[in-house]
């Protein structure tokens, strides 16, 4: 592999699509807190002055969807009509139905260990040793930039910031190793009164420099800070938002393949979510065990069937074992049936709203980021 560039982007919690994701996961968490066996598929749409929450939910729990929605929007920071969106005055509409009994009969079993997958589908997990969290660097630093934007907005360091923001980071690689950063883009919503020069200086000194390692910056690194020159109208006033539209931001920033299924608003019986988390867990433990420098795993499922219909692994020439041997180790050490992966990662609990902004992976507070299988994988590998 010769020299090449690779780019990933992220968006802040105030981006319209991320508002929708966070509302969907806030509803999911509130339900799981009361009913861990609930079936939830919650979708959200946001636009100027309104939120619509819909989907299919089967549960014994009762939650106040309107209050959950307003609380989530308020915590993000949309608290005044001059932002085009106000937690206290926006309309909240609800269109919730129940999960189809045709799906239930394929999922529920007398023996929960034989629980079938809630749908067909394919999921990917990925890990790389290029960062300490075993994630690709471009998405890791893209997330870090918009997370820092949120921090300095909320603590008042840059009081003219508003909730909506986007980042993009282009890394330069040589023979697969990072040699620097070629470009950084950061666009942030702001109040009308701040000058472009103050904004550029504030973003550079307060957001970019504290986040990006200086050794990756050089005289040729390009910075694009609010390159249009103005970003006052943002959030749902600028664009409508929908749950599940940021699936590449949520995962690996394009560095790995994606099966197409979104995460937010889905309970763990939906393998779109739970199997993608388990696949990350597997890939991360393989890399942590030193069995590969990079690892991508694919799993697939059929609706109503417990066992995965396929498992495949790609190590991009970095594997220390043949891939069929790695797959055998995965089958030995990980239960990838829907019930098994829910139990393995303790997923039937309210942990999801925190995942809905700044990435689902590379954050050690989540159970699928543990590397507690690495030692056993290494021991059984024969290396």
UniProtKB/Swiss-Prot annotation:
Which annotated residues bind L-methionine? 56, 99, 239, 270
Q: Where in the cell is it found?
A: Cytoplasm
* This protein's pathway: Amino-acid biosynthesis; S-adenosyl-L-methionine biosynthesis; S-adenosyl-L-methionine from L-methionine: step 1/1
Q: What is its EC number?
A: 2.5.1.6
Uppermost EC category = transferase
The UniProt annotation places ATP binding at 15, 164-166, 230-231, 239, 245-246, 262, 266
Keywords on this record?
Answer: ATP-binding, Cytoplasm, Magnesium, Metal-binding, Nucleotide-binding, One-carbon metabolism, Potassium, Transferase
Q: Name one GO biological process term.
A: one-carbon metabolic process
Its GO CC terms are:
cytoplasm
Q: GO MF annotations for this entry? A: ATP binding; magnesium ion binding; methionine adenosyltransferase activity
Official protein name in the record: S-adenosylmethionine synthase
- What is the organism field in this record? Shewanella amazonensis (strain ATCC BAA-1098 / SB2B)
């Amino acid at each position: 592999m010769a020299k090449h560039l690779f780019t990933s982007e992220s968006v802040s919690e105030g981006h319209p699509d991320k508002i929708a994701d966070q509302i969907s996961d806030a509803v999911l968490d509130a339900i799981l807190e009361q009913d861990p066996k609930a079936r939830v598929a919650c979708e959200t749409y946001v636009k100027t002055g309104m939120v619509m929450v819909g989907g299919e939910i089967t549960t014994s729990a009762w939650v106040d969807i309107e209050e959950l929605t307003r609380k989530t929007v308020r915590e993000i920071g949309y608290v005044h009509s001059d932002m085009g969106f106000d937690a206290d005055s926006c309309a909240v509409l609800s269109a919730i139905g129940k999960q189809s009994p045709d799906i239930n009969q394929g999922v529920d079993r007398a023996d929960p260990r034989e629980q079938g997958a809630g749908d067909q589908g394919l999921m990917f997990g990925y890990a790389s040793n290029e960062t300490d969290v075993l994630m690709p660097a471009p998405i890791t630093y893209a997330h870090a930039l918009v997370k820092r934007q949120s921090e300095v907005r909320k603590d008042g360091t840059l009081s003219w910031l508003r909730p909506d923001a986007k980042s993009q980071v282009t890394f330069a690689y040589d023979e697969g190793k990072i040699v620097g950063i070629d470009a950084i883009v950061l666009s942030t919503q702001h109040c009308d009164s701040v000058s472009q020069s103050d904004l550029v200086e504030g973003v550079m000194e307060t957001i970019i420099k504290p986040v990006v390692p200086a050794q990756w910056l050089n005289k040729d690194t390009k910075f694009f800070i609010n390159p249009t020159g103005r970003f006052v109208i943002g959030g749902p006033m600028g664009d409508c938002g929908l749950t599940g539209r940021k699936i590449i931001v949520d995962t690996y920033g394009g560095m790995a393949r994606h099966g197409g299924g979104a995460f937010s608003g889905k309970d763990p019986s939906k393998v779109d979510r739970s199997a993608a988390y388990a696949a990350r867990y597997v890939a991360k433990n393989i890399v942590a065990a030193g069995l590969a420098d990079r690892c991508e795993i694919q799993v697939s499922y059929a609706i109503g069937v417990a066992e995965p219909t396929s498992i495949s692994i790609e190590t991009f020439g970095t594997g220390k074992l043949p891939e069929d041997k790695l797959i055998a180790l995965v089958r030995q050490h990980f239960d990838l049936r829907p019930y098994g992966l829910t139990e393995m990662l303790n997923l039937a609990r309210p942990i999801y709203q925190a995942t809905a902004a700044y990435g689902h992976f590379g954050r050690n507070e989540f159970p699928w980021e543990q590397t507690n299988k690495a030692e056993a994988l290494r021991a059984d590998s024969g290396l």
